[in-house]
């Protein structure tokens, strides 16, 4: 009977296998947004600029297996650190489960369809551009507030 309960409802984040952990990612792409931090206040601002390695259609990483070598500052979420990333969006499955909330209906694990995150307009698809298209000195002009 316990096997009929989805793993994300019966396991703690720390007890999940690597494949289970990876499958929690809904593919929204929000963690790949470039962020700016105010040096005085520490406040983090999201931009509509994404990592150069994001596929703008699927919102997936084109170099996922090599991402940490190619992008040294790439975010690595773990069960121990997920809640320390205060900038993670409310919709993030890792944050959702860490806070004890259920996965939403549009999450691919619930819907069985990886496109539901896009259909629900939760992903960044259609709202972002590659960081390569904007000089870094102009990134402040790309601060957004629709992320949360």
Curated annotation (Swiss-Prot):
One family name in Pfam for this protein: CxxCxxCC
Full protein name: UPF0260 protein Maqu_1608
Origin organism lineage: Bacteria, Pseudomonadati, Pseudomonadota, Gammaproteobacteria, Pseudomonadales
Native organism: Marinobacter nauticus (strain ATCC 700491 / DSM 11845 / VT8) (Marinobacter aquaeolei)
InterPro entries noted in UniProt: Puta_zinc/iron-chelating_dom (IPR005358), UCP006173 (IPR008228)
Record family assignment: Belongs to the UPF0260 family.
């Amino acid at each position: 009977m316990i096997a009929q309960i989805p793993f994300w409802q019966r396991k703690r984040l720390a007890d999940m296998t690597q494949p289970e952990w990876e499958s929690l990612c809904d593919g929204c792409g929000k963690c790949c947004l470039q962020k700016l931090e105010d040096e005085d206040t520490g406040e983090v601002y999201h931009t509509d600029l994404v990592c150069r390695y994001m596929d703008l259609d699927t919102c997936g990483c084109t170099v996922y297996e090599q991402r940490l070598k190619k992008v040294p500052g790439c975010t690595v979420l773990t069960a121990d650190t997920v809640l320390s990333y205060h900038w993670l969006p409310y919709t993030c499955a890792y944050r959702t489960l860490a806070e004890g909330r259920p996965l939403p209906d549009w999450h691919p694990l619930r819907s069985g369809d990886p496109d539901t995150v896009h259909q629900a307009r939760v992903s960044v698809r259609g709202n972002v551009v590659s960081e390569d298209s904007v000089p870094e000195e102009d990134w402040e002009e790309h601060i957004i507030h629709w992320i949360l």
